[in-house]
Structure formats: C-alpha cells, structure tokens
Amino acid sequence: MSRMKKILSVLFVLFIVGSVYGQSSKVISQILEEDEITVGQLCYLSVVYQGLANEDVNFKDAINILYERGQIPYAAYETNGVALINLAFVYSQIWDINGGLMYRITNGSPRYALRQLKSDGIIPSRYDPHRMVSGSEALDIFTACSLKYQKK
C-alpha cells in the first residue's frame, strides 16, 4: 500500500471514529475490514450513534433494540450480509430526512429511503439496490449521511 493511501486510510478511520462518537475502535476496525457488513454491525452503528445503547452492546442486542423500536422490519440473524436497500432504510431511521413525496407517504420505506439517499447524492445512482455493502462503503455512507442530515 502506498504511503499516501496509508495516510488517507488513517485519516478516514479517525474521522469515522470521531463521527460515530467514541464507538469501540475494535468494532470500527472490524467493520472496515469486512467484505460485507453484517446486520449486527449495522445495527450496532445505529444504536450506539442514536444513544440507545452504550458501545459495549453486542450485535444481537443491537438488532433487538432496533426491532423493538420499529427501526428494522424483522430481527435478522446477526451475521447476515446487508443489501444496499436495507442499509439505506436503517440509516434513514437515524436522521430526520426531509424526503420527497413518496418517501413521506411510505414513511421512508426501504425503496424510497434508497431513492432519497441517491437523490441527495449520498449513494451513486448506478448502484444496484440488492448489491451487498462492504464495511468501508457502509462507513462512507454513514459519514455522508451524518454530514448531510445531522442537525447543526
């Protein structure tokens, strides 16, 4: 790996760790290394960022917390991979997104959550909704959402 890539990777990780408010660096490092982010890891990011649990929460409990709050439609197995459409839906539950008409009518259904994130330039429009998301992509999208939708 070139020196510039290493420096950029370190800066990126530091930015992510800061934007996720002190979440366990071990978990963030693990997510960055994943070819596919898991449901457990995705739910962990969401519950810790929202302050629904501390950073010691396990993935299974994170899934149950989001399920009980209605932020995910079903309690999936924690090691399942995450498709882009489902990642967009989980992220849309974190922030108050002023979406388009269909997004509001459907209460941010997965389809329209993804369309909104694409419309807002967070996710490239050419991406297939059912493609599996890598850990680094999930954190990139998380950071972009945080910058775009976080209340100032």
Positions of PLM-derived features:
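Terminal recognition/anchoring or ligand-binding modules at protein termini
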Residues: G22-D56, Y74-K152
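Sec-dependent N-terminal signal peptides
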Residues: I7-I16
